[in-house]
């Protein structure tokens, strides 16, 4: 059976981090969209994700940038997308 892929916007927030952890426990390949500034200082902006960070695929982007979103969706091709 093919591993499902999920893409989460808002993955750095409380709900996004809980959802990511839950989906990982179900065997999903989890991808998240984060703003570039979060990747520049991960211990400050990504602290909720630190326990699971090694199992996540994070992509730099913003919902205001159609080209960035298009590239992420094209590259990831998620089975499910969660906008939080």
For each feature predicted by the language model, list its residue ranges.
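N-terminal Rossmann-like NAD(P)+-binding domain of SDR-like oxidoreductases, especially those catalyzing
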Residues: 1-84
């Amino acid at each position: 059976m093919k591993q499902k892929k999920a893409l989460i916007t808002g993955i750095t927030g409380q709900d996004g981090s809980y959802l990511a952890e839950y989906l990982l426990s179900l065997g999903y390949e989890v991808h998240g969209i984060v703003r570039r500034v979060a990747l520049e200082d991960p211990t400050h902006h990504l602290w909720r994700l630190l326990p699971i960070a090694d199992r996540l695929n994070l992509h730099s982007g913003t919902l205001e940038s159609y080209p960035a979103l298009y590239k992420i969706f094209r590259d990831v091709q998620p089975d499910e997308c969660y906008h939080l």
